[in-house]
Amino acid sequence: MKTLSSLLLVLAVNVLLIQASPDPDNRCPARKYWNERKQACVCKRENRCYPIGAIFDPESCTFSMCQSKGCSAKQIFNKDKCACECRNDQPKDGCGAGRYWCNQDCSCKCSTPMSAGGCSGSQIWCEKSCACVCPNADKCTAPQVWNKDTCCCGCPVNMQEPADGCTKPLIWDKVDCRCECPLKKDCGKNRDWSDSSCSCECKGDGKCQGSKIWCKNNCRCICPTAEPAGGCSAPLKWDDDKCSCACPAKMEEKKEKCVESGKIWNPNTCECGCAQLNCPDNKKANKETCQCECKEVKKCNGGQVFCKDSCSCVCPGGDKDKTCTAPQVYDGVACSCSCPVNMQKPADGCPRPQKWDKEECRCECPVKHDCKNGKVWDETICQCICPRDAPVCTAGKERCGESCECKCINREPKEGCAKPLVWNENTCKCVCPADKQMSPGGCGSGKSFNKLTCQCECDQSASKCGLKRWNADTCKCECQPGMPPEGCGKQTWISDKCKCECSPTITCQAPQILDLNTCECKCPVNMLAQKEKCKSPRQWTDSKCLCECSTTPATCEGKQTWCGEACQCICPGGDKNCGNKKFFDKPSCECKCKNNPTCTSPQVWDADDCECKCPKDKQKPQGGCDGGQKWNDRVCSCGCPVPRPDCTNGQIYNINTCACGCGIDKPSCPKQQIYNWKTCDCECPNGMKEPVGGCGAKTWLDDECQCDCVPGKPKGGCTGAQKWCDKTCKCKCEKEMPTGGCENNKKWCDETCDCVCPQKNTCIAPKVWDAKTCSCICVNPPKCNSPQVLKDTCCCGCQNVKSCKAPQKFIENICDCACPNKKQCKAPLVWSDEFCDCVCPNSASMKTCLSPKEWNKVTCTCDCNPPKPDCCPGTQKWMDDKCKCGCPNAQTDCAGGKKFNDFTCSCGCPSGKLDCTGNTKWSAETCTCGCGDVNRNCGNLKNFNDNLCQCECKNKQEMANCKSPRTWNYDTCKCVCKNADDSDDCVKPQIWLDDQCKCGCPASAQMTCPANKRFIEKSCSCECKSPMPSPIPQGKKWNEDKCVVECANVKTCEGPQRWCDNQCKCICPQVNTKCSDKQKFIESKCECGCETQTQCKDGFRWSNLECGCLCDDKKCPGKQVFDKNTCQCKCPNQKPGDTCGNGKDFCPLDCSCKCKNPKPANGCTGVQEWNEEKCQCECPKDKPKKQCPGGQDWNNHQCQCGCPTPAPTCSNNQKYSNVSCSCGCNPGKPKNGCPGNQIWCDNTCRCVCPKNMEKPADNCKTKWWNDEMCQCVCKPGCPEGGCKGVMKWNANTCSCECPADKAKPASCGDKKSWNDDSCSCQCKSKMPCGGCPPNQQWNEKDCECKCSATGNCPAGQTWNSQTCQCSCPATGKCTGAQVWCSKACKCVCPAQKKCDSPKTWDENSCSCQCPKNMRPPTGGCNAGRTWDDATCSEKCAATPKCDSPKVFDPTTCGCKCGNKPNKLDAGRTWDEQKCKMTCDLPAIPCCHYEGQVYDSNTCKCGCPKEETCKQGFSFSPKSGCKCILECNKKDPGCGAKKIWCQETCKCECASEPPRMGCGPNRYWDKEDCACQCLKTKVCTDSDFSFFSHDTCDCECSNAKDFILNCNQKLNKVSCQPQCIQRPPPEGCAEKFGEFFSWDPKACECKCIEQKTTVKGRVFDKATCNFKCTNEPKTNPKCANTAESWDSQICACKVCSTCKH
């Protein structure tokens, strides 16, 4: 039931999914269905079966017996007409004027082709517009516009080159359509380019500061005196501001530091001077610090540090710090105690759980325990284990780790064995007691002894009894009750079913069935009803239960069929009335002609009308015969009447029109000429004939029907300023020479059409040539102020330059000598024009100051330098004569070892009073600590210590080196072992080692063990690290030397097999033994192959993968198809005896019938084409016979309609139309249509205005009538488009008006008035003539001068509206150490100090601070780190001691590998714990090639060693790592994926098999050199199913089309998404609530929001249920404690079952 309900549920979900999703079949028409993989409608399978010879049409999914033919790409085959038709329909409105529809190309074509001379100029022929057009797009960059005649861009009419050319030196630019400079230069930083003069002009105003003068040539201020010729002496550099040699500006800071440090600054060398230093050989003098420093600062290794005194690397500490305990030795590089080289820690570390003992320099167990219960201690694993030589436990038992005894693996159950079983310790099972055991065969037949129940039981079970009952005594199935006493009657007793039934031997033939009551065969009840309806001539048959004819059905003739109702042969439609000419033939059931005569060709017999008629392809045209031709029924064609007329005037007789004509349909005349059908020649139209008086200066061109200049305008145009005159066909000047001749000695030039200078002189820069005055002039010369004058350099300068005496300089502004930088001097200093500086007034009589005082140029007095401090240190006083602080009573000698103290100015101990150690005391007289009266006799081994006032051992070095496990004996002054009493406990071969204070092996027994062994201290010998396993696998043995289990017998392998040490046998290397279904694995070849190979038939090939012959698809010629059964090409649906019919033969290559009589050699007549189907000439399909328009007739040879000849004569204003075959307007409607809004009128043959746009009765009033536009317009001469200012033209009012966004306001205010030209309010008063005051600008809005800048002043400053500037107050408030600076108008530090990097100066605190990005973190430093304020960074709180090769890492404050390389080798990774490189992939157990082994260093397989081979042999790693014969063969060409291996002398795969094999269900194919699937599948479950060679399974091609959520997965059978979790069996509503429903997209039960409303309730989506709208939000919800809230009635009610 569960299975049925789940199936019904799935069916219901699928129905919902089908209903929810749109029906894909609705997208497709009948006979088709939607294919998801192809994303298109395809034919259904039931519509794909068709009869032999039929043609299937995939568009309509139908079949036709018509043989399709090859149509062009634009055509499609019509099976109804059995012919090609256009895919696109002919345009409804036709192809347009001058174009016709072409059925062969399925497109519109031009009626008149391109003229013989082609298109003019750069134009090309356009098939769409049937006219000559430009090939390139009309995209021109402004201001150029497009020219349709020349097909190129050019300047517009209003932007043409001036008639007299551009004013020099400007030239015309054809791209920008304007006059520009011929070449624009880069003027540099001091000049700007001028587009008016085409030259560079100076930027500045010509004013210079200081002693510099302005130079017009260089456009900059320069020094009056130049830099010395040889330059300044190094390191001095020329100072362009001071105009003299001086130290570079960057050395000013260096100079200040030099002066502050007390050194001497040399202005000539720009360096600080030091006193002479005498440095050793390994040191050099530092001029900056004036000290001796090491010449080379070495980078020390390990723990060494660099000593600046000795200039070498040394270990820190004294000799005591360099003493190590055995066996450690002191490392002079690492500066620490470490193990010797032969006792280093293993590279792979100690075997676990052993740990490395740094002091003992060996691997030891961390703790050693005493073993109990028969266990022994294992030094390798550091545990107590059971003895390894203990015997193996019997089956079902294992050795217990606690007692080392064999105990049962399965313990006795806690509740004991099930009764009557008891526990047996030997067998470890619950067994029957001995008194209840039964011997074999003791239970009798049919029974056996059950060891679980300890009793005899039946062998067979009661499950086989079915309807019978089981008898446990007899162990048999018995019927109960048995057969009835009265018997079964006609039925038989069935003992297996224990009931009476009909005998199974009785069988009834269909359709009869067995009657269970009578056990007889009878017809079914539903078929007996037909027996009553059975009437004559049919009879009822009981055996068949049918009403049928008594006689068997006769074989009917022809199309007659047997009728079961009448029991005779009849025609399907009965007899027909065939008329007079036909009779009814019963065998064929058809009407046939009474007479069947033979028709004369080309007539054929018409079986329908029973008479001879013309064939369908030779029927009389619907519109009759063309021209004057008439129809002939006997020959079935149109022809001209006889006799034919004689033609004149060069005309010939036309058999198509049966009249005389020119003999051509489409004449080709020059562009302007027309064809004269009377004279059969081309001629110019009447309005374009050659003038009677000739063309004058021009020549008549007959092809163009016009007069033109020959030769025409020159290709390059007219020279100079001349222009082409079309009337005279010559170039000439528009401007004539002046009547009075040229001025300023100029001459007239016909080329330029202007007066020019006779010669142009070369001007010296910066002067330029002036073409007006024909002389050199300055461009924009400056106005020079007195006493300066204008020079030839076009600059203002002095006439005479004086030579001034230093330090005065020549000032060019005043043209005289003066001081360049005169300034105001502070008292008592005064200004001196002689020195150009502030000097003392008595500088001439300056006094000579006594040393150490110096002359002060500021105070003009002798002062101390440095000056007197505020206070002297200690008790010192200021000595003005010496200019320093000192003691006036200074002494040189003091009594009792005392020294004079300059700070206190008195005698005293040099070090002051010291804290004495030990028993010593301080003496103020001797200034030392002493012992006083103490016994100083200490013996030979000891000395007296004056510091401690006691005796101590002499050998202090030995005492300092005495470390654990030794101790120092102060009485004997010796280092002795703490455990010296343990020397008697040593067991041989160990002895007491006094240097190590323990029992150990003697030196003679010490040895270095191999890598696979370790040294055992107890036995003083080497033993294997890994113990011998027990038991040893079969076929292997233990090697004590190598400490490994190895193969007992190593064999030599044959073929591709190689020896594997793991399995001790020859195996195939890295080969998957799982082969495909039809292949078997061949051990000798190590590959999958076939057991036997047979010879394949022609066309078939042998497949090693399928182990059989396969047929490959081939491309057959022509229309032949490939037959996989015979593997041959043959024609489809061809049967023996097939014929093509009359007039055709079968062609096996094309599989089609071809005409016996080929196409005529000269082709078909006229425009007719050959029809391969009918084997005759006929009109092409694009020119089928049609109903001709107007009076035209059909021409069968030309396959087109034409007018009858001769044509009628038209009136003067009309002409004959070849389309309507009638007279019409001459000339007709203009080609470009009527101008403006006019329309064409056929009655008057001219363009007229429409009725709704006729001229008004008032004659447009003030406007003029435009006949072309059919509307009233403004009178000409009005300024349309030429309004002043921003005003625009209004076509309605015919006047200039202001735009809507600039309408005139009601008022402009007091200061402004309205201006019509600008359409805006303008100021009444203008800006003052002299301009606005400084810093002010004219404000157009307020009509007055205002400050140009805003009044936002910096903090502390105020705004002055008169001067438009910010001003600073005299005083201000500052915080901290800052003071107020009125010049800078801010608080500043009184002094600034240079900070040591990385600290910077902080203006707020006036001190050096760490930068903001280098401050201590807010949360404090990380664990193990502290803040260093000197470096503004974190540092490690402690430096750990790292074991080599690890080193200290300051970033993590821990240890890291110091030997880690920057780049790892390929295929390797870094082990941070072991500090070495390891392989990134697991080791290869068995290498691919024989003899190779896996190398953990290279992570690859390779030969253990390489041999040197003799001549003629070479070493081969791929052939057993041995010498083999050299290969003499050459590369035969191995093909794709393979290369020639000279080493193995054969083709091998270019790529090796994957390192770890191909993986499951895949194997390595040596032929394809790739991993292949073991089995392939045919994936046809879905249209999207395909077999993937990557996964070796069926996959879906539409997997990317679905975006699956977490609850969905893709079903690979249907290739459709399905839910991972199925809907609950009981349904969503039953499980979660009545409003829950299954969502197939989300694959979960979702709440369905209810839109229906319930009175007093609202739907709550959170609970997915209706809740009461009046439910209280308080708790408790009911005020009365005796009541509770009832959500069913939405009210409080008394609760009868609640306890309150």
From Swiss-Prot:
GO terms for cellular component: extracellular region. It is found in: Secreted. Disulfide bonds: none annotated. Keywords: Repeat, Secreted, Signal. It comes from the Eukaryota. The keyword Signal applies. Salivary gland. Residues 1-20 form the signal peptide. Pfam families: CXCXC (PF03128). Has 82 approximate repeats of Cys-x-Cys-x-cys. Used by the larvae to construct a supramolecular structure, the larval tube. Balbiani ring protein 3 could play a role as a transport protein that binds to other proteins intracellularly and in the gland lumen in order to prevent these from forming water-insoluble fibers too early. This is Balbiani ring protein 3. It comes from Chironomus tentans. The gene is BR3.
